[in-house]
């Protein structure tokens, strides 16, 4: 249970153990007592069950201050459960910092005890389409793509969609109506995921203002940070949670790495909701094909493409070719006669071929005019130089 005291957590643990065991359990005073009760109950099942699954969701929430939860868990696992061949212990936790530092990075008894880490990736476009169809929602692929550009591939968000309404109506109800379910999700998300949520939000909100991303040094300077340790941890956590990506601009070494915000829900929230005191409850329905909608769509579609590099490579017939992914930008310098140019996506292949990709959002097949083709060829020549 989120943000409850140790005593409240222990009381709920006792209730659940009573429910599953069918026997009234005394309320434990410590986590050591709680795990001792769990051990006693599981011992009665060892001979009659081929497999026993212990599943604890949101494990970090149990580790309240001075609770000794992690040490009690250590004793339970190393002192007994790990020796039982038919017991599997599965834990989940959205608090990335805790899971990384306290469980995966534990220097005590839980060190190197993890059998396997499970990465729950968001749905891709195809999986999103199949999920929506399973809910009886039959939209065009353009509508599915726009839905993805707003919510990403997060099943929890996609499951909120009501098949009785159109995509714009659903977005209005979920984001802009009074009491909308996703209107405050951003604040809760960061508080539950990260211990120092303020720093993480500052980083994300800064990166949201820079389309191409920022270097580590630029972020430190903009946020007036004097120590790089916390920033490194924050970057790593944000990357592991799929909020941002780290990439190199073509031709630059790792020390010039860029950090870019790529989480689609966050990009949408920061663009249309955060800081807006008054919001039209039908904003999205009324914004269709507006200049603001078109500008957002272009950038969001670029991020959608970056979420589907494997699918792009497959379509190009190079899925099995080792590839580095870059972007590239050259700033204009009139004094030196240097033209400005930018390439959204570069696939630098092991077979000594480089694909230069332009990402364009369009409601219909994009028509490459002779003038636009010439522009692309000129950009290619600038890149070659």
Where are the predicted features?
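A cross-kingdom feature that marks ATP-driven nucleic-acid transaction machinery
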Residues: 250, 257-385
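Phosphate-binding site recognition
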Residues: 1-286, 291
């Amino acid at each position: 249970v989120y943000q409850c005291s140790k005593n409240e957590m222990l009381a709920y643990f006792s209730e659940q153990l009573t429910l599953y065991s069918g026997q009234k359990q005394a309320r434990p005073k410590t986590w050591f007592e709680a795990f001792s009760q769990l051990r006693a109950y599981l011992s009665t099942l060892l001979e009659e069950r081929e497999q026993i699954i212990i599943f604890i969701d949101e494990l970090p929430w149990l580790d309240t201050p001075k609770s000794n939860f992690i040490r009690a868990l250590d004793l339970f696992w190393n002192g007994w459960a790990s020796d039982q061949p038919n017991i599997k212990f599965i834990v989940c936790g959205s608090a990335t910092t805790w899971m990384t530092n306290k469980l995966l990075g534990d220097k005590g008894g839980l060190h190197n005890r993890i059998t396997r880490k499970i990465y729950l990736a968001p749905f891709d476009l195809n999986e999103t389409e199949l999920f929506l169809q399973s809910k009886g929602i039959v939209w065009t692929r353009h509508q599915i793509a726009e839905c993805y550009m707003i919510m990403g591939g997060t099943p929890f968000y996609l499951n909120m969609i009501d098949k009785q309404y159109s995509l714009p109506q659903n977005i209005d109800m979920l984001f802009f109506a009074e009491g909308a379910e996703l209107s405050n999700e951003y604040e809760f998300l960061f508080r539950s995921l990260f211990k120092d949520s303020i720093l993480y939000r500052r980083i994300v909100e800064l990166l949201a203002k820079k389309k191409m991303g920022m270097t580590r040094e630029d972020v430190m300077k903009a946020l007036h940070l004097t120590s790089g340790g916390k920033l490194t941890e924050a970057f790593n956590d944000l990357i592991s949670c799929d909020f941002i990506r780290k990439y190199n601009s073509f031709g630059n070494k790792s020390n010039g790495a860029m950090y870019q915000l790529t989480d689609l829900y966050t990009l949408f929230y920061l663009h249309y909701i955060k800081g807006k005191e008054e919001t039209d409850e039908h904003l999205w329905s009324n914004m269709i094909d507006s200049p603001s909608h078109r500008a957002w769509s272009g950038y969001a579609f670029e991020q959608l493409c970056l979420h589907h590099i494997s699918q792009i490579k497959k379509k190009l017939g190079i899925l099995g070719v080792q590839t580095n992914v870059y972007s590239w930008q050259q700033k204009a310098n009139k004094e030196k006669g240097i033209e400005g140019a930018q390439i959204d996506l570069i696939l630098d292949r092991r077979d000594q071929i480089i694909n230069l990709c332009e990402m364009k959002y369009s409601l219909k097949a994009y028509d490459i005019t002779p003038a636009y083709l010439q522009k692309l060829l000129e950009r290619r020549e600038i890149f070659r130089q």
